[in-house]
Design a protein with these regions (language model features):
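Bacterial N-terminal signal peptides
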Residues: 5-14
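Transmembrane beta-barrel domains of Gram-negative outer membranes and organellar outer membranes
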Residues: 19-288
Length: 288
């Protein structure tokens, strides 16, 4: 774990590119990472707890790489700290997104497959399936319960002028237990606040901001397919291109059910390194 934090400044200083992340935290659209580019992101989820619950802070790191124009792979490393309890490492995830069609269409499908090696203390809530995360049990109990899970998503996404609309249907299977399937959803829209550049070098100008809203939550399981008794949220989202290669994102998510936290706060910082794949290929090619 310490290796990644030591390596991060070196990677950030090596190369730059122009990129702006979409503002979603849970919903996926059809835009893939550029081939050969590496996107590094540090994000976190925290909440306003209900009575009897404890405040937590759940950070994670993402390493997203564009393998081809239609295939993006991503590694997540996560943990969490619960106030008055402890700090724990909660596991890792490896996701792959595949875009079947090369050209833009009215609706653009993306196939998503993720393997998760987590424990039950995970609270980043990158998605919500079933009834949602356990935020009441102590970490000492949750960290000893491992879960090897396989998650799939059908992503449908469309661009209309400067607007994006996306819908995700989520299915997750716990491979460690003889459980059924759990379901969830995410959907959202966003747009660029201005499509014409101001003509000035300005980071606070409207063209550097994307804003929208996303909706996400659980849909129960094969035992009880329902949106009731699950966590559900509506969340304004915004991203700000703070430099040619870095983006800040923020989102307050408001709980719609008693099983939801009253508010989930999410924030993230991403930095894209252009052409790292070809640079590494040339480096190792010269050593042969």
């Amino acid at each position: 774990m310490r290796f990644f934090f030591l390596l991060l400044p070196v990677l950030l200083a090596s190369m730059v590119s122009f990129a702006q992340e979409n503002p979603y935290f849970v919903t996926y659209d059809h835009h893939m990472e550029e081939p050969g580019n590496l996107d590094l992101e540090v994000s976190a989820t925290t909440d306003v707890p209900r009575a009897g619950q404890k405040y937590y802070f759940a950070p994670w790191m993402e390493f997203e790489y564009g393998v081809t124009a239609r295939w993006t792979t991503e590694l997540y490393i996560e943990g969490q700290t619960t106030y008055g309890d402890s700090t724990v490492f909660t596991g890792w995830r490896l996701e792959n997104r595949f875009r079947p069609m090369k050209r833009e269409h009215w609706i653009n499908p993306v196939l998503y497959l993720e393997y998760e090696n987590l424990n039950e203390a995970s609270r980043i809530q990158k998605e919500i399936v079933g009834g949602g995360s356990d935020v009441t049990s102590p970490n000492s109990e949750l960290r000893n319960t491992s879960a090897h899970e396989l998650e799939t998503k059908l992503i449908l996404s469309s661009d209309f002028h400067d607007w994006n609309v996306a819908e995700n249907f989520i299915v997750e299977k716990n491979l460690s237990k003889g459980e059924g399937f759990e379901f969830g959803y995410a959907a959202g829209f966003y747009h660029q606040l201005a499509t014409l550049a101001s003509g000035e070098k300005c980071r606070l100008c409207r063209e550097n901001f994307l804003a929208g809203v996303e909706f996400y939550g659980g849909l129960g399981s094969t035992l009880n397919f329902s949106g009731r008794n699950t966590g559900n949220y509506v969340a304004p989202v915004v991203s700000w291109l703070v430099s040619d290669n870095a983006t800040l994102r923020f989102s307050p998510g408001f709980g719609l059910t008693h099983e939801s936290s009253p508010v989930l706060f999410r924030f993230g910082y991403s930095y894209e390194i252009q052409g790292i794949g070809s640079s590494l290929s040339q480096l190792f090619g010269r050593k042969r």
